[in-house]
Amino acid sequence: MRRVLITGFEPFGGERINPSWEVVKQMNDLMMGGVRIVARQLPCAFGEALTALNTAIDDVQPVLVLAIGQAGGRADITIERVAINVDDARIPDNLGNQPVDQPIIQEGPAAYFTRLPIKAMVQGIREAGIPASVSQTAGTYVCNHVMYGLLHRLNQFNNEVKGGFIHIPYLPEQAVDHPGAPSMSAHSVLVALELAISIALQIEHDLHITGGAVH
């Protein structure tokens, strides 16, 4: 049976929950068109997150890997285009590490592009009435660290496997502690992630439409 690995993070930065894991854990053992979804939680820690991810990939042997993370302040589902080879942490991770301008992979390329049909995924999610867009940066914290490490592995050892990263907004129960911050319901995020998986599994070549940004 084909399997999809989807990951979420533990809470970080003083938050009580992390929306990525709150939604992703609901998808564990979900069957979608003959494909089984396997959910795993990653620690919000440089290095440790990639160790956990690589262990999960070895265990699950997926055809698709989707890593999900919290992007507090963003209003929509944002599918990441690129990961860069640098850790530059504005705040410490959950183990107290705060790397500055450190490469994720020594001698690795400057960046990797996603292995997902991101524009088709955005279009499909929008057609379901859920705000979504292509993001041009995954940041320089643990989310980018995981995306870069994932794509490095896939490019080196699992070239047939699709993979990438999706950022999601705060849940409403988090936004109450951040006045003015946008949020999205867990149900909407869940629907969006199910659509993202379905489209990623079906589409081999992305849509030739704009998903760029002016700044």
UniProtKB/Swiss-Prot annotation:
Keyword Hydrolase tagged:
yes
Check the record and name the InterPro entries matching this protein.
Peptidase_C15, Peptidase_C15-like, Peptidase_C15-like_sf, PGP-I_bact-type, PGPEP1_Cys_AS, PGPEP1_Glu_AS
| Species per Swiss-Prot/TrEMBL record | Yersinia pseudotuberculosis serotype O:3 (strain YPIII)
Q: Which keywords describe this protein according to UniProt?
A: Cytoplasm, Hydrolase, Protease, Thiol protease
Reaction catalysis annotation? Release of an N-terminal pyroglutamyl group from a polypeptide, the second amino acid generally not being Pro
Origin superkingdom: Bacteria
What quaternary structure, including any partners, is listed in this protein's UniProt entry? Homotetramer.
Annotated catalytic residues = 80, 143, 167
Q: What is this protein called?
A: Pyrrolidone-carboxylate peptidase
Q: Which residues cross the membrane?
A: none
Q: What does this protein do?
A: Removes 5-oxoproline from various penultimate amino acid residues except L-proline.
Any one biological process term the GO annotation gives:
proteolysis
Lineage, highest ranks first: Bacteria, Pseudomonadati, Pseudomonadota, Gammaproteobacteria, Enterobacterales
Under Enzyme Commission nomenclature, its number is 3.4.19.3
Q: What is its main location?
A: cytoplasm
One of this protein's Pfam families, by short name?
Peptidase_C15
